[in-house]
């Protein structure tokens, strides 16, 4: 089992952007189920680290439920657009004001 831990290299990309993991759940759910299905009791730092992605876990869950998000966007009057390395969230408040948030990665 020690051999299975050795081939776990750090992220493949030289520059690692945690926000990219939030936006691209395809790359994140692969490491997460491995950690959840193989709980190592002798790696407490890993468990501490799992808490950090758990905050993003809610984000990856929500991006996993894209139909639900689209359904909510119709009711809540907000939309998300992804263009290249930027994500734009546009929302309308009940008072009619429009709020736009753009994340550039």
Curated annotation (Swiss-Prot):
Q: What are the alphabetically sorted keywords of the record? A: Early protein, Host cytoplasm, Host G2/M cell cycle arrest by virus, Host nucleus, Host-virus interaction, Modulation of host cell cycle by virus, Phosphoprotein
Subcellular location(s): the record lists: Host cytoplasm; Host nucleus
Query: What ranges does the record give for the region Disordered, renumbered to this chain?
Result: 24-85
Q: Name one GO cellular component term.
A: host cell cytoplasm
Q: Where is the composition biased (Low complexity)?
A: 24-38, 53-66
**InterPro entries, per the entry:** Papilloma_E4
- Compositionally biased tracts (Basic residues): 39-52
| Protein purpose | Contributes to multiple aspects of the viral life cycle including viral genome amplification, suppression of suprabasal cell differentiation and egress of newly formed virions. Induces host cell cycle arrest at the G2 phase by associating with and preventing the nuclear entry of host CDK1/cyclin B1 complexes. Inhibits cellular DNA replication by preventing loading of host replication licensing proteins MCM2 and MCM7 onto chromatin. Within the cytoplasm, associates with host kinase SRPK1, a splicing factor regulator, and inhibits its activity.
Entry's family note: Belongs to the papillomaviridae E4 protein family.
Name of the protein described by the UniProt record: Protein E4
């Amino acid at each position: 089992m020690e051999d299975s831990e050795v081939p776990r290299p750090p992220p493949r990309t030289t520059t690692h952007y945690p926000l990219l993991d939030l936006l691209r759940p395809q790359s994140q759910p692969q490491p997460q189920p491995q950690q959840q299905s193989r709980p190592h009791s002798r790696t407490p730092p890993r468990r501490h680290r799992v808490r950090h992605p758990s905050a993003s876990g809610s984000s990856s869950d929500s991006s996993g439920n894209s139909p639900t998000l689209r359904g909510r966007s119709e009711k809540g009057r907000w939309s998300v657009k992804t263009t290249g390395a930027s994500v734009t969230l546009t929302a309308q408040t009940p008072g009619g004001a429009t709020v736009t948030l753009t994340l550039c990665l």
